Amino acid sequence: MRTIFNAKIGDAAYIQDELSSSLSSSVASKFKEFSKRKRISDSFSDLSEELERIGLRQMRKRIKLEKSFERTPKKKVQTKKHLPPVRKKDSVKRRRIIIASPSDEEHDGKVQTNDDSSENKTEKPKNQSNCSSNASKLSEAAQLLNVSEEKSSISETELERSRQVALNELNKSERFNKTETQLDISVMEVDSSDHDEEEKTEKVGAKNNRSLYEIVDSDDEEEQDQDQSDAAKPAESENHSEIKKSTSFMDQMSGAKGNKSVYEIMDSYETEDPKEAGKNEESDKDKPAENGKSDKDKQAETEMSDEDKPSEIKSPSTIKKSIISTADEEALLAELASSDLSHLEKMFNPLQKSRRQSLHVPSPELAAKNPKLRRRSERVEVGNDFCPSQSFVDMVAEKKRQKNKRKRLSKSLSGAPEDLEEMEIKHERKRLKSSHGASTDSMEEDNENETMTVAEEHHSDGEVSNGEVPIEEKPTTSSEKPSASELPEEGNSAPPALKKDVKRLQAARQAVSHAVNLLAPPKATEAEPRTLSRKLSPQPPVVDKKSAKQKKKGKKKQKPQEASPLKSSDEENHGHRIRTNAGYVTVVDEPPTKVPIIELIKTSSGMVRVEPCTPKQKYFRELPPTPKMHGFREEPGPSGMSRKRAKHAAPKVEHNSAKQAALRFKEQIFARRS
């Protein structure tokens, strides 16, 4: 560059060409290097991002798996290291069962993949030289992740399926969402070739990884149970449920298989159907999901699972126990079905008011044979030798017929059915007294005549009906009682027609009285007619008399308010007192004109008003038209002379003009005579 700048100024074009060529070559080389580095860094960053994404995905899957493992039961397969050491006094050959545990393989694979992912996360590129190694590591990690993903997908689907089975087997009451329907168990569709390959790999894994169980001969069962109970105590704190299941499994195996060799047991287990094995696995998974249930539910489930297992595994003792328990239950159910439990309904009912009764209730057969008798007199009827007379039979039949009749009782009435007719008669008399208290003897006679005519009509109707229907002759002697079914028919065949007619008459009367009350004004009912009007009116009073309380209220008349005496002060009596030159003049109000009370007379046609001009007495005299009759008031005359003397000897009147003028003036002012 220096050489170029030291050249002549005239060679500007040359300098420009040289500069551009040198710059372009250097920039191009640098740009190439930069783009190369950029490409590598971009590829590495892309790889790192991809790795992070895969790692996050894997972490999420791992968390999901852990959660599903918590929900769903883990396979509790007891390996040899968990099994407590069994001490035996006599040296007996122990037979071993080898069971595959594929969960260990999955666990190892997961640990490896997690370690690789954690290592890959921590690694970051620092120089260009590390890029190739990092890329190779990344590709390896991706391959491992893909492999682990393939493995975990199968296990995840299996776990999900088992979880759904467990949730379906839960009762509806124990679910959180009680309205939710049963979960649909999605069935996996797998190609047959892939499935066969997986089965082969599983079998190989099962052969490689097997756990051991010790099974002792059936001769030493008792000693083994004792040793197991002794050995189980320290291990209970760590894995209580696992030890219980393992011991029960060992007991079943020892009871069922007896003194078989190792190979026979292995063969029998290997030859089991794969479906049954899958069922057992599912039941094992379901057990921890239902840990929230009570101990009773657990016991019931264990019994059910024992029943579901094949009959080869069950020992004869357990079979006997189950048969005995079922027989007991059946017997108990049969007893309950046969016994009468009606008393239990009333026993704990708080609304049922009764005496304290013992729980022992006699059977219905005994109660039907020996009925409890209320009175000693009724015990006579129990004997079969009792032969009643015809009159007694008729009397019983009549009583039953009377009882079967419909009786209309008011709420206030209460009495035995025998006294009903007497009570009704008394009630009717009281009502008649209250309504017809003011009526005279003639009215009562009319009433009696009406009722008699009604009765005669009814009697004549009865005679006609009896004449039409032939009378049945009663049997003279009959030792047997009439059947209960015949008695109510007799009661229904002869209804009381007289009562119906009387009721119709009463209803008609009530309707007429109601119409009259509507026609007459309400004030008319207040004033009662006098003795004369009663004598004039031959009809009984239609309107029912008021009750005693209303009468008392009516008697209490309002007292007339007495006017206070006039005071002399002008302030108070300024409206009634006028001051004049002659003196004070008091203005007195006219007395209120008496309104004539209109009286009423009850006639056959109805209520009649009495006008004021109608005479009130039998005999009367006509009064002369005097000024007093027209409202004038008399005042006493001048004192000193009697009227007789004034008539016979008139006094001499002195004509004084001045005096007369003064009197005239006085009259004009005061309008009064002295």
Swiss-Prot record:
Biased composition (Acidic residues): 216-228
Annotated region (Disordered), positions in chain: 65-137, 168-321, 352-382, 395-585, 618-659
Residues bearing PTM Phosphoserine: 248, 358, 391, 414
Keywords: Phosphoprotein
UniProt signal peptide: none
Biased composition annotated in UniProt, kind: Basic and acidic residues: 233-245, 272-312
Skewed-composition ranges (Polar residues): 127-137
Domain of life: Eukaryota
UniProt keyword Phosphoprotein, yes or no: yes
Biased composition (Basic residues): 73-97, 400-410, 548-558
Stated name of the protein: Slender lobes-like protein
Species this chain originates from: Drosophila melanogaster
